[in-house]
Amino acid sequence: MPENVTHVCSDTLGLTRSRVGTVVLTKHTRKYSQYFALLCKFLKDCPELCQDFPFTSISTNFDYAARTHRDSNNKGVSMTKSFGAFIGGQLRYWPDDDGEGELRALRKADSLTLDTKANLALFDGARAHCVLPFLGERYSLVYFTIEGHERAPKETLDKLRTCHVSLPVPASGAWKYYTQMLSPPKGARAKS
């Protein structure tokens, strides 16, 4: 969370891990399945995508300028888009972050700035990233895949499919396509 912020407006739709570690549909997905399906269809219908983007979950955010972090429980391959009447709020992303160093040691010169308001942005959520400060109202969607999604019950996975989710199959098809678009991180040592 940003400094001096006590809460953020953020929810996850799709799959999540329960407190005991099982993979389940979030309560908001069960309650608002048509809304979830609409967000899934939005991504599926994007003309910029060459292939259906594989994911299990969507993080929905309002006015959240995330500090530099690496996502936990995210297999990495992520797609994001932001909306609203705001200025700033780009995604800063370190494509060569290998997750080994401390976040405070990252150099701004090694990052990319992605305009998620103008375009969808593909990034690896397990690598360092943050949202730059903004003015106005900013909404964002982050499509990602949770670890262990394949252990979800069949009826849960079937429910996702009925909501237009293209489930990831790690060694084939779209998952391989998008993973290969993200070059392997070089790490901090490669920059020395």
Whereabouts are the PLM-identified features?
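Fe(II)/2-oxoglutarate oxygenase catalytic core
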Residues: 1-122, 126-192
